[in-house]
């Protein structure tokens, strides 16, 4: 009988808490965390890590060690675009963070090639790294 070992997701949760704190302390944004942003197309509830100013979805993807989480990034684009289309949000940003050695796909996800392909399908969703997030969303 196969069993699946539980994965330590505490680093992702810690990262969410850190980003929420940074936004609250170093920006004028209205910040809400773990918001139910509507129903997914399969009927399940869709929770988003952070919602800024009531209309911008932020999905945080922190990867500490190599794993399958990064393979779910294209699916995250789809879910976020559906939330925008179905529930009236303006835009969404996926933020990838964590040590470069933990990501096999990070450079590709941040490449113009990938971004171009995804924007043609999911026009209101983008992907950036942590440094770009800090530069765009926090006081300088």
Regions found by a protein language model. Name each.
Residues 1-38:
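Acidic-basic catalytic patches of nuclease active cores, encompassing PD-(D/E)XK
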Residues 14, 22-27, 104-106, 113, ...:
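Eukaryote-skewed repeat-based solenoidal scaffolds used as protein-protein interaction platforms
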Residues 26, 83-89, 120-122:
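A structural motif corresponding to the C-terminal end of an alpha-helix
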Residues 40-42:
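Non-catalytic substrate-recognition and accessory regions of acyl/acetyltransferase enzymes
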Residues 44-58:
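Active-site beta-strand-loop-beta-strand hairpin of nuclease catalytic cores
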Residues 62-114:
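Catalytic cores of nucleic-acid endonucleases
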Residues 112-140:
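Non-catalytic C-terminal interaction segments of nucleic acid-processing enzymes
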